[in-house]
C-alpha cells in the first residue's frame, strides 16, 4: 500500500513508507479541521487537517486499526482513524511533498480521541454531507480504535487500557455507497481552536500498531 500525506505542515516529521512497521507522528497547526455543518448550525465547510492515508476500493475494505496517544491541551484537539471518499482526484500541493483536495468532501468518517470541555472522549464524527458527532467518555490519552466491516455495516470500536473492546458506532450506509474513485483510509490530526499562544501553537499525535486489512 502506498501512503500519502494530505495538507501537511512545514513541521511534519518524517513519515514511514510503511506505517504498519514503525510508530509515527502527525503534526497539526491551529485552525484546520475536518467538519461540515449547514448554515443553521454555523455554516462550516472544512476538510483541511493533516491526513496520512492510502487509496483502496471500498469493496475490498475489511478492517483498520491504530493506537493513538497525544498530549491533548487545546479544545477539540483530536487524532484518530479516517475513511474518506473524494469526488475528484487529489493534486500535488505547492510544497511538492503532500496532496491537496480541490473541494471539501461530503462523505467521510473519523474516529479517535478528542478533548472536549477539558475531558478526553472517544469521538466519532461522520459527514454525509453534514457532520454528526457522538462522544463516549474515555478519560485517558491513549487508546486503540478500530473500523471493521461486519455484516455489511461499518462498526467502530475502542480498546482502552483495560483491554476491553467497546462498540461505539454502527454506520449502515457506508458500503451501500458506490464511489467512482477509490476511498482513502488512514489517520488524521486536528487542532481547530489552537492552544492560546500567539500563533495558536502546534499539536502532535503519535500513532502505532497501525494496520489495514482487505478482502
Q: For each predicted feature, which ranges?
A:
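Extracellular glycan-recognition regions
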Residues: 1-215
